[in-house]
């Protein structure tokens, strides 16, 4: 199976970890079309109906932080399974539903969520995706 960084951190540190998710309804993103491909500025499609991102968009707020402590109404409300979009270093809008959406109970996945309704792509500091010689930085999970 696949594990995300949040699952690994929660497994290692339990309730000492605070997991924060990020969502967006639309905008632009810097991502590649395939592993090892060059970074591109891509338009992010509007979120699918009945997704977490669509629900947050319907609030009419441009951006917000949603805290979900154990006894909060938000945590209870977000127990319902919803589609959630994951955009990382790869973004494939042409297969977005299959490539980037999954079913989740958001309040089981995160302790808080930052929603930015419309994002703007970041510009890469280094405009190449080629490997460079040298030792790879440790990133699992202690090196994060």
Go through each PLM region and give its residues.
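C-terminal regions of proteins
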Residues: 1-144
């Amino acid at each position: 199976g696949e594990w995300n960084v949040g699952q690994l951190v929660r497994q290692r540190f339990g309730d000492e970890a605070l997991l924060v998710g990020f969502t967006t309804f639309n905008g632009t993103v810097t991502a590649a079309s395939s592993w090892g491909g060059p970074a591109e500025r891509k338009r992010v499609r509007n979120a699918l109906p009945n997704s977490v991102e669509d629900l947050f968009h319907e609030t009419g707020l441009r951006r917000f932080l949603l805290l979900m402590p154990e006894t909060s109404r938000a945590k209870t409300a977000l127990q319902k399974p919803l589609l959630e979009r994951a955009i990382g270093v790869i973004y494939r809008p042409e297969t977005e539903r299959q490539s980037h959406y999954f079913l989740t109970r958001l309040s089981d996945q995160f302790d808080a969520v930052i929603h930015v309704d419309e994002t703007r792509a970041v510009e890469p500091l280094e405009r190449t995706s080629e490997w460079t010689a040298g030792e790879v930085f440790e990133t699992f999970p202690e090196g994060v």
